[in-house]
Amino acid sequence: MPAEGANPFAQFAQALQWDRARWIWLLCAVLALDLVLGLGDSVAAILRYDRSAIAAGGWWRLLTAHIVHLDLHHLLLNELGLVLVWALFADDYDPLEWCIIVLSGALAISSGLWWLSPRVSWYVGLSGVLHTIMGAGCARHLAVRAWDRWILIGCLAAKLAYEQLGGHEPALVVVDAHLYGAISGFVVGALLSWRVAIIRQRSRAAGPSPSLRR
């Protein structure tokens, strides 16, 4: 990680993640989202978060709702968001950790909608999971004392507060999903960072130790 006193612009350039393998994963994710949209409305109806359908046993919707989109415009907005957050946070965790973060975030969002937002009858889209990624990234940047940690946390907190205080169009955006996603991502990211820190402390005397990414 660059020193905190280094040139902020140089640090930001280094913070962007351009590892080829990770961008191949991103491309695969984008293509998968495109494929789901191309399957049509009948498939989307089977995959989306639908409160009555989940109550009837459609538990898979708790996960699949996050890969379904309303239309091409909705999909492209979320794919753009995915590219941006991936550029900032891709290298903060290894592939297994990212799987844990994304899956736990998807479940946390759907569970939050189920238990805490009963008025939400249906939901689709990746935006909640994007906030999970942002929350996890903020947790890791905070753990390693990255120069941009307070900027990222402040921007995310301000966005969530703005949405929760009514600065959105409630008919179009389920902002509770953003809140649940960000909280779950931050918590899981903090736990993963704490785990690595503990392992590093315990193995310090034994030789090379795991390091927090960034």
Regions found by a protein language model. Name each.
Residues 75-82, 124-135, 173-193:
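Alpha-helical transmembrane segments that form the membrane-embedded catalytic/substrate-binding core
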Residues 90-98, 140-150:
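Membrane-helix interface "capping/anchor" motifs
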Residues 47, 119-126, 144-153, 169-176, ...:
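A cytosolic-side transmembrane-helix exit/cap motif
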Residues 35, 87, 110-115, 137-138, ...:
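Alpha-helical transmembrane segments of multipass membrane proteins
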Residues 29-30, 104-106, 148-159:
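Central hydrophobic cores of alpha-helical transmembrane segments
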Residues 16-19, 51-57, 144:
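Helix-boundary and loop/linker segments of multi-pass membrane transporters
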Residues 25-110, 114-123, 173:
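N-terminal TM1-TM2 helical hairpin plus the immediately adjacent luminal interfacial "cap"
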Residues 1-20, 163-214:
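C-terminal transmembrane module of polytopic alpha-helical membrane proteins
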